[in-house]
C-alpha cells in the first residue's frame, strides 16, 4: 500500500493521469504475497472507478442486455458531450481507446510497467490505478516483467500497448 501511495504521487508529479491516495491503514491480519507481511489497505480517489471489467462482467455473465444501460449511464456521467448524439456509443468507445492509448504512451515514456493490466485494473477514463506489482525500468529492458507471477510475460513492459488494445 505504501508503494502504491508513492507511485500514485510520482505519477501525479509526472503529469500522468493517476488515482490519488486518501488514506492508508493497517489491519491485524497478515497477508500472504511472496512472503507473509502485515496487511494494509489504501482508499483511493479517482475521477471514476468504472473499469473495463464492469462491461466485461456483463458480457461473461449473460447480462449483455444491460450494456446499453451501463454505457448510457457512463456517457451521461463522464462523456456528456456525446449525450444527444446518435453515435454516442461509438464516440464513447473511441474516446476510451484514445485515453487508454495516451495513458500507456505516458507509461512507456517514463519506463513504467504496470504489472497487472487485466480489465478490472483499467479505467475507462485513462487513469492509472490498482498499481499492484508495478515497477520502473532502471535501464532499457523491453521484456521487463515486474509481476513475479507473470511467467509468460503477458504484462511485460513492451507488451503493455498490445494489452491495452486487447482490453
Language-model regions, residue ranges each:
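Conserved N-terminal phosphate-binding loop of PLP-dependent enzymes in the Aspartate aminotransferase
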Residues: 90-93, 162
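Mobile, glycine/GP-rich and aromatic-enriched active-site lid/loop segments adjacent to catalytic centers
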Residues: 102-110
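Conserved ATP-binding subdomain of kinase catalytic cores across diverse folds
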Residues: 1-86, 102, 124-129, 136, ...
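Catalytic activation segment of kinase domains across protein kinase-like and atypical kinase folds
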Residues: 30, 36, 109-114, 118-165
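Glycine- and acidic
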Residues: 81-90, 150-158
Amino acid at each position: 500500500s505504501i508503494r502504491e501511495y508513492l507511485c500514485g504521487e510520482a505519477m501525479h508529479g509526472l503529469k500522468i493521469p493517476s488515482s490519488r491516495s486518501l488514506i492508508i491503514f493497517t489491519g491485524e491480519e497478515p497477508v500472504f504475497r511472496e512472503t507473509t507481511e502485515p496487511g494494509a489497505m489504501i482508499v483511493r480517489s479517482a475521477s471514476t472507478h468504472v473499469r473495463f471489467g464492469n462491461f466485461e462482467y456483463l458480457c461473461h455473465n449473460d447480462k449483455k442486455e444491460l450494456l446499453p444501460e451501463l454505457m448510457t449511464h457512463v456517457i451521461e456521467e463522464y462523456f456528456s458531450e456525446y449525450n444527444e448524439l446518435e453515435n454516442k456509443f461509438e464516440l464513447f468507445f473511441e474516446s476510451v481507446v484514445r485515453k487508454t492509448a495516451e495513458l500507456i504512451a505516458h507509461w512507456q515514456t517514463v519506463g513504467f510497467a504496470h504489472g497487472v493490466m487485466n480489465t478490472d485494473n483499467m479505467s475507462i477514463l485513462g487513469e492509472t490505478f490498482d498499481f499492484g506489482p508495478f515497477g520502473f525500468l532502471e535501464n532499457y529492458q523491453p521484456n521487463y516483467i515486474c509481476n513475479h507471477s507473470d511467467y509468460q510475460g503477458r504484462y511485460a513492459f513492451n507488451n503493455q500497448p498490445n494489452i491495452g488494445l486487447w482490453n
